[in-house]
Amino acid sequence: MLKHDYMQVSQDQPIYSEAPLQLLLFVDGRPKSRQQVQRIRAYLKELQAEYTFEVQTIDVGQQPYLAEHFKLVATPALIKIHPEPRQVLAGSNIIAQLKNWWPRWQVAVDAYLKLQEDLQEHMDDNGRGTLPKSTIHSVAVSAELIRLSDEIFRLKQEKDNLQEQLQFKDRVIAMLAHDLRNPLTAAAIAIETLQSNYNLETGEFQRLKPSMTAHLLKQARNQTKVIDRMITDLLQVGRGKDTEFPLSPQKVQLGKVFLDVLEELCDRYTAKSQEVETDIPSDLPYVYADPERIRQVLVNLLDNAIKYTPEGGKISVSGLHRTTQKVQFSIGDTGPGIPVENRDRIFENHFRLQRDEGKEGYGIGLCLCQRIIVAHYGQIWVDSAPNNGAWFHFTLPVYPS
């Protein structure tokens, strides 16, 4: 009789078999099951000396779809897939179970072979048998369908993510066209005014007082910074949350950076008659941080505070030496606050409150702030009550003395 060696099911090309008795041995990589698998293989090899059958070994780690197809809950497991009905042997006594079932399996094999002989007479005109193939082929096809189903699900998720990114980019392009117009117009007016009043021969500005010249130069500089900040924020967030965030940490006096940013945004909160209250102790320790990155955080948080605080409202800025290793900074406003159900989501990329859909912005500012603070091994969070404003807090490491 033809004897079949042990075979490993190919991960890419499952083996199709016509053997009358077909078995699948499911194994895993656990050291505890290794000895049991070796004993099962040895016993099957003894049986192969006398009987015709085929065993295919399947590593569940490499082919989980087959394990899912047979709904296996434990390994090792030995499955008779042909002739039908299918039967699963599992547990610590597989060899004992095999000895018990083997005679009945042989009876089923004899019955199958007898049926094959009887059906040899049923041939079509081209000499092809009409007996369906009941082999590992059906198992492989089912497993492949499961794998393809999982792959389709994964691709659908990727497609949804890409569509979300495309929608975000479309929204950003539309918003950029709107939001960039204001600072561009302001900068252009300031520069054109300076240019039209500049005398090349004398090298002086005509009809402009020194204070007005300084104001126009500051206006042009501030507006170009606004444009640069918009573009920088978009590029950094567009890289994705898993992208490495480069930092150049150094000794920073954050209180001074706070005051510089407040001065930069002075025109904005002054235009809304907003009061700015600062409480930054003079003995606040230096922090270990990237000044440009932290400046981005301060600009974003203060920009939001100005945007959402009504005219005549108050913005508060404070610093606190929380521990020997951390310094906490806080920015509060008297705006509408943040609903409780949205406090955990406001740091998500592209997330915006429904009430803010009509306001300028891209839903990336707080996400960017969180990425920067986390990159500094700090924390950022919000305290808020509806109609009572919001307080944003973040911590940074103290510069080691």
From Swiss-Prot:
Transmembrane segments: none annotated. Homooligomerizes. Interacts with KaiC. Participates in the KaiABC clock complex, whose core is composed of a KaiC homohexamer, 6 KaiB and up to 6 KaiA dimers. SasA and KaiB(fs) compete to bind to KaiC. InterPro entries: HATPase_C_sf, His_kinase_dom, HisK_dim/P_dom, HisK_dim/P_sf, KaiB_domain, Kinase_SasA, Sig_transdc_His_kin-like_C, Thioredoxin-like_sf. GO terms for molecular function: ATP binding; phosphorelay sensor kinase activity. Keywords: ATP-binding, Biological rhythms, Kinase, Nucleotide-binding, Phosphoprotein, Transferase, Two-component regulatory system. The N-terminus interacts with KaiC, while the C-terminal histidine kinase domain autophosphorylates and is probably responsible for self-oligomerization. The N-terminal domain stimulates the C-terminus to autophosphorylate. Its EC number is 2.7.13.3. The modification Phosphohistidine is found at H178. This is Adaptive-response sensory kinase SasA. The gene is sasA. Member of the two-component regulatory system SasA/RpaA involved in genome-wide circadian gene expression. One of several clock output pathways. Participates in the Kai clock protein complex, the main circadian regulator in cyanobacteria, via its interaction with KaiC. KaiC enhances the autophosphorylation activity of SasA, which then transfers its phosphate group to RpaA to activate it. In addition to its output function, recruits fold-shifted KaiB (KaiB(fs)) to KaiC to cooperatively form the KaiB(6):KaiC(6) complex (independent of SasA kinase activity). One of its GO terms (biological process) is circadian rhythm. Gene3D superfamilies: 1.10.287.130, Glutaredoxin (3.40.30.10), Histidine kinase-like ATPase, C-terminal domain (3.30.565.10). It is an enzyme of class 2 (transferase). Signal peptide: none annotated. Pfam families: HATPase_c (PF02518), HisKA (PF00512), KaiB (PF07689). It catalyses: ATP + protein L-histidine = ADP + protein N-phospho-L-histidine. Residues 175-400 form the Histidine kinase domain.
